[in-house]
């Protein structure tokens, strides 16, 4: 027997959003993701559902190649507010870098992700709503991670090459 998805009602969206938020707080990103897909099936441009879906996908990052970075990226690029898009794309790159750091990935693969997160947070900070320092807070967290992990430093990568070094024969 084939089971088919059922559609929620338009009037049920606010309650579905509340449930999706609750499941995120309970660290159940798969449930949040499912609810967001139900909302987006009837209202494809729902901004809160898009934002939560993107974040629910990043909540599942483990630092492996199977992480759904591209999917989260395409979802978050559908955000129409430029500040929100930049801010959440910054979080996307930050979370990917942190997951890869926890997974023990090579430091040289992480620095570009942190740098892209910082670029997004910097641009978001320039256009942030008055009184909203979220992008600054995320910027500072990324900088602290870089300071606390000297292997991630671009300077470290550059100092490993000496002028008298030559390529292997």
Where are these regions (language model features)?
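Structural marker of alpha-solenoid helical repeat scaffolds
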Residues: 42, 78-79, 127
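Short coil/linker segments at helix-helix boundaries
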Residues: 57-78, 88-123, 145-163
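Terminal, low-structured helical/coil segments at or just beyond the last alpha-helical repeat
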Residues: 2-4, 126-169
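N-terminal interaction modules that seed assembly of large macromolecular complexes
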Residues: 25-59
């Amino acid at each position: 027997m084939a089971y088919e998805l059922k559609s929620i009602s338009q009037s049920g969206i606010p309650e579905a959003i509340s449930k999706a938020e609750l499941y995120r707080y309970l660290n159940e990103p798969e449930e949040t993701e499912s609810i967001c897909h139900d909302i987006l099936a009837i209202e494809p441009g729902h901004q809160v559902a898009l934002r939560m879906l993107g974040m629910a996908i990043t909540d599942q990052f483990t630092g492996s190649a199977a992480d759904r970075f591209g999917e989260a990226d395409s979802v978050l690029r559908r955000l129409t507010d430029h500040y929100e898009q930049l801010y959440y794309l910054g979080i996307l790159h930050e979370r990917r870098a942190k997951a890869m750091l926890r997974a023990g990935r090579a430091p040289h693969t992480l620095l570009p992700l942190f740098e892209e997160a910082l670029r997004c947070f910097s641009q978001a900070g320039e256009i942030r709503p008055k009184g909203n320092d979220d992008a600054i807070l995320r910027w500072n967290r990324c900088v602290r991670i870089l300071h606390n992990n000297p292997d991630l430093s671009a300077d470290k990568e550059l100092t490993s090459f000496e002028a008298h070094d030559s390529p292997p024969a």
